[in-house]
Amino acid sequence: MKKQTIAIDTKSVRSDVYGSLSVPLYTNVSFEFDDASLMADVFTGRVKAPDYARVENPTVTNLEYRVQKLSGAAHVTAFNSGMAAISNILFAVTAQGRKIITSRHLFGNTLSLITGTLKRFGVESALCDLTNIEEVEAAADDDSCCIYLEIMTNPQLEVADLKALSQIAHKRGIPLIADSTVIPFTETSLKDLGVDVEVLSSTKYLSGGGTSLGGLVLDYGTFPQINERIKGDLLFNVGAYMNPYSAYQQTLGLETLDVRYKRQAANALYIARELRNIKGIERVTYTGLEDNPFYELARKQFGPTSGAMIAIDLASKEACFKFINNLKLVHRATNLFDNRTLAIHPASTIFGLFPERQLEQMDVRQTTIRLSIGLEDPDDILDDIRQAIG
């Protein structure tokens, strides 16, 4: 059965007693039991059934089950945001005195989590150029607990060799954890490239309409202790499980993800090619362009599509602000992969609290605009960009 059919097929998915064709929304907090013995068996894990909505809910379980079928993951856990998913997977693999090997080019909040929050608890980090395998090998040692990366960085659109990184990780007996938000898991097979755990913000492509927060951890089962810690410890003690309304919306979003993503990716490629011909745009960064330095590696790892994020560089920060202010169709908003096209100036928004020196180290330029391409007609998007450039 093809992935698009699996995403929509409800006959093979856990359903409710009334045979609801669409996923039912369960908003209850607790569940009633027939007797005390059954209640004890459920709460101690001898019988599998929901006991409390902070750790299990049928609507959320439905989403987890569908994602598991689509991805081939051994275990899927849904969290209430992308950052909650990232935090919990890192909580599961690290401890005081351990070291996370990661990129200098991380999403701002992820970088702050690793170098700030976790550092306060005694967790170290090595910020590397993950495209430089020798540098990563030199950073890996007995204290390392994982290699963590984004499969395509935001907004730099840098791509690292996942197989090479997985070999370094597995030589040390540690997992390779990949944030796959930029390319949907339905389009890739990261497990075949040596990725042990995928983490993603389901707020983005799965939500689509920008109406629900969520995050997913897709665990491929190569390190059994990870799922044991997430399901047996962190869900209970951290309390970051996805809320049922988000799961309901994102399950419906999953059913149309294939159609929406392919349109967005096609729009992005068409627009990226045309942007190179617009006077005033000094650089266009998109891995689907044949002259992009990561073009071949991206196609090898992620297939024929390159996602819906484009970075453009203008002459100055002032030119970027003027461009954003002039937009009429494209929205000034910070989400990614919404149905609508969005634009931000990353250096002053999602990286706005970082000092200039650190922005330079992260290759976040004051001249960069990030575009998240939506479902509008691509020529209408281009017309708006042209008039905004002036």
Regions found by a protein language model. Give the residues of each.
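PLP-dependent enzyme catalytic core of the Aspartate aminotransferase-like
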Residues: 115, 124, 260, 318, ...
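Short, well-ordered beta-strand elements within core beta-sheets of diverse protein domains
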Residues: 249-259, 307-315, 370-374
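Short loop segments at secondary-structure junctions
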Residues: 30, 219-224, 314-318
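Short, solvent-exposed beta-strand edge segments and adjacent coil->beta transition regions
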Residues: 47, 245, 305-309, 366-370
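Conserved small-domain helix->loop->beta segment predominantly found in fold-type I
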Residues: 269-328, 332-340, 353-360
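N-terminal "arm"/small-domain region of PLP-dependent enzymes with the aminotransferase-like
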Residues: 1-57, 369
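Conserved N-terminal alpha-helix of the aminotransferase class I/II PLP-enzyme fold
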Residues: 35-84, 109-116
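Conserved PLP-enzyme active-site core in the AAT-like
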Residues: 7-14, 75-280, 285
